[in-house]
Design a protein with these regions (language model features):
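"A position-specific structural signal for the A-helix of alpha-solenoid helical repeats
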Residues: 7, 41, 48, 109, ...
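Conserved structural position within tetratricopeptide repeats
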Residues: 29-30, 91-98, 132-135
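Short coil/linker segments at helix-helix boundaries
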Residues: 48-95, 116-125
Length: 196
């Protein structure tokens, strides 16, 4: 029965029906939690959702900075909407880790989200996650690269994580016209230390 749900979920993905695949992967995982195919499909589909939510949280922060007109070097607290977006992304990541605790891409995303949410308090937790990943898979070259990005405060952006060219807004004003920042491609994150 489970393999049928897995096959249905894969077919839904092929048709581009993400919501149906999401629901079917949950059903397959609930029916047979030890089935490796169901577990892997659940992890992959839910990881895609977690990536979307993580990107949405970053974009919500950028839009909030624009709306509140917060200056580049000014300390700020996230608005409740931004905090909720980060909480949803963290919950989605934890959901994947509940089913596949050794999924390295999900653990990388968790480290990036923890660090991105608050660089000061998130740095030690992110480094702990990444160092455990590096110990588990020393051949993965992406992990040491990410560790180096997180270990050292970025000189380019003053360790804010925001693009120094557009001040984290994703757009620059020239002759009273807003244009997408060419350095960060409108994302508002530092091109040197932006994680994931």
């Amino acid at each position: 029965m489970t393999s049928t749900k897995v096959d249905e979920a894969k077919a839904a993905l092929e048709r581009g029906e993400f919501d149906a695949a999401f629901r079917l992967s949950e059903q397959a995982q609930a029916e047979e939690p030890e089935d490796p195919a169901a577990r892997e499909l659940y992890a992959v589909i839910h990881l895609a959702r977690a990536i979307r939510l993580s990107d949405h949280a970053r974009e919500a922060r950028r839009q909030d900075l624009l709306r509140r007109e917060i200056d580049y070097d000014e300390e700020f607290q996230d608005s409740p909407e931004v905090a909720r977006a980060y909480d949803e992304a963290a919950a989605a990541i934890d959901d994947v880790l509940r089913v596949a605790p050794d999924h390295w891409k999900t653990r990388m995303l968790k480290a990036a989200l923890v660090f991105r949410r608050d660089r000061e308090s998130g740095r030690p937790q992110a480094l702990e996650i990444l160092q455990a990943l590096a110990a588990a898979d020393p051949t993965n070259k992406q992990i040491p690269f990410t560790i180096r990005k997180i270990e050292r405060p970025c000189d380019r952006c003053g360790d804010t994580g925001f693009c120094p060219h557009c001040k984290g807004r994703g757009q620059r004003r020239f002759l009273r016209m807003d244009r997408k920042c060419e350095q960060c491609y409108g994302r508002g994150i530092c091109p040197a230390c932006g994680v994931l």
